[in-house]
Amino acid sequence: SGALSSDRLWHFEPKSFIRHFRKCSWLDSDVIEKIMVANTKSTEKLQISKISKKVTEYFGAINTIINKYNLYSVNRKCHFLGQGAVESESLLSMQEVSQQQLIENGVHKGGAIVGLSTKKESDLGHWYGELAEEKDDYFSGKKYNSKGNLITGSYSWINGNCGDVDAQKYRGRGFKMLTGLDTYSSYWVYRGWLSINDFDRYWWDDPQYKKKNPPKMKKRFPQIDSPQKITENTYNCLDTGGFFIVGFRGKTVRIMDGDKNGKVDDNQVIENVTSAINGGYKGLAERKIFTKKAKEVIGDDVE
């Protein structure tokens, strides 16, 4: 009859079971939390509590975006989360904050964080800098850290920005810190918030743009009234991250896929992914910590 007798044992073949179970790509909030606190000391209870609350807030959107952008393989998830943990400060900051810039004994240094730059723009009721009294020179000037090391230069005339106002208006926002009018306008078109007929492509190639003279430009640059839409909900915050990697940094996914079963050195792949996303290696040590933790809690290679 084929029935199992009382002295026979039936079980799943372990490796096949794991392969099948892994087809469920949804990550539990506990798993995401372990990744996000990877660079936080166990004694920092308050910080861990803050991160835990943010994980509860964002984990649904994280899973939705991972599936939406086909990032659900183990490698892709690990790198996506490891990189995003650094950009978003473990989900605690979905908008770029500014730092006072000081000169001490002739040396440029970064000072305290500007409090207003940390405030949610949904609470402000507008994008930070829309009011004249909120003008923040951090975004349009050179940026130094507290040790006097140059972080980066002005945002005013890069990434399609058309001056000092744009430098602040299109500051980094979202899980991957979407930055600049170029990337903002592409995302706005993608979401249907802006028509491609409302501006001219490659406006930064206009001779007057190169002269930093927008009023004389013949090419029309995009007009975006509410850049803070990126951070108005958890979905938008994460969606910009998926869009940036797949839409703007497509080769990043191929680099992630090259990280298979320990055949390629972890550090080298993380460095390659970091460079592909950012064009440099800012925060590399932290990116390695978060990505390796993600591999530890998500990865379970089956030969």
What are these model-derived regions, one by one?
Residues S1-I158, C162, Y190-N197, Y202, ...:
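Cell-wall glycan-active module
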Residues Y58, Y170-R171, G180-T183, C237, ...:
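Alpha-helical structural motif
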Residues R76-F80, R171, F175, T234-L238, ...:
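Short runs of predominantly hydrophobic/aromatic residues within well-ordered alpha helices
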Residues C162-Y170, E232-Y235:
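A general structural signal for short secondary-structure junctions and capping/turn motifs
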Residues A167, R171-Y187, R191-D198:
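Amphipathic alpha-helical interface segments
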Residues M177-L181, D239-G247, S275, G279:
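Short, hydrophobic/amphipathic alpha-helical patches that form generic packing surfaces
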Residues I224-E232, N278:
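Active-site rim elements
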Residues K229-F243:
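Internal mixed-charge
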